[in-house]
Curated annotation (Swiss-Prot):
SMART domains: RAB, RAN, RAS, RHO. Its cofactor is Mg(2+). GO terms for biological process: antigen processing and presentation; autophagosome assembly; Rab protein signal transduction. Pfam families: Ras. This is Ras-related protein Rab-33A. The gene is RAB33A. The lineage of its organism: Eukaryota, Metazoa, Chordata, Craniata, Vertebrata. The modification Cysteine methyl ester is found at residue 237. Keywords: Cell membrane, GTP-binding, Hydrolase, Lipoprotein, Magnesium, Membrane, Metal-binding, Methylation, Nucleotide-binding, Prenylation.
Length: 237
């Protein structure tokens, strides 16, 4: 079973402006507030973006999928250290003709990014540079957490992208690398780890922002992520 591969890149706290946009869903009642973390999944068509979101949000692999047109999103409520958090996963189209009208919308107020490639298609890996450029070109703060995911690892005989090459790329772009399969039920825990890793980091960053804001009497400053913060969360990465 393929395991997540952790690169030397670290997930750093998002910018103060980005963190300030983390939303609260208070529609249930005045006593219950659920934070919403918006995570977008981007990459070439047919790399398995939709299947990854189905596996995480519903625990299933769809029998049949069609090319995503524009953007779609799925949600899953998770509990981290006693707090319920809604993880909103935005599944984006990989084809240019479906992206033009929606691209600004799904990059708006993003909290974390998942870049996906197909380990059996080298072109999907080489195109990652294009996706990163698009992300940067839409003013996504450079400190927004990002991870790299190599999907379809169940097709072991067809792998074209070696792990060491992917790890080198992830390190160069300050990302963690996960290799997994949305199709293989045995890999479901690894798919879960991708999104839970980001959710844990975002939760920790937001908590730090609140404490800093209180100390500064409402004045928000950029935060340095403390080394011990990782041990205080149930973060899988």
């Amino acid at each position: 079973m393929a395991q997540p591969i952790l690169g030397h890149g670290s997930l750093q706290p998002a910018s103060a402006a980005g963190l300030a946009s983390l939303e609260l869903d208070s529609s249930l009642d005045q006593y219950v507030q659920i934070r919403i973390f918006k995570i977008i999944v981007i990459g070439d068509s047919n790399v398995g973006k939709t299947c990854l979101t189905f596996r995480f949000c519903g625990g299933t692999f769809p029998d049949k999928t069609e090319a995503t047109i524009g953007v779609d999103f799925r949600e899953k409520t998770v509990e981290i250290e006693g707090e319920k958090i809604k993880v909103q996963v935005w599944d984006t189209a990989g084809q240019e003709r479906f992206r033009k009208s929606m691209v600004e919308h799904y990059y708006r107020n993003v909290h974390a990014v998942v870049f996906v490639y197909d380990v059996t298609k080298m072109t999907s890996f080489t195109n990652l540079k294009m996706w990163i450029q698009e992300c940067n070109g839409h003013a996504v703060p450079p400190l927004v957490p990002k991870v790299l995911v190599g999907n379809k690892c169940d097709l072991r005989e067809q792998i074209q992208v070696p792990s060491n090459l992917a790890l080198k790329f992830a390190d160069a772009h300050n990302m963690l690398l996960f290799e997994t399969s949305a199709k293989d039920p045995k890999e479901s825990q690894n798919v879960e780890s991708i999104f839970m890793c980001l959710a844990c980091r975002l939760k920790a960053q937001k908590s730090l922002l609140y404490r800093d804001a209180e100390r500064q009497q409402g004045k928000v400053q950029k935060l340095e992520f403390p080394q011990e913060a990782n041990s205080k969360t149930s973060c899988p990465c």
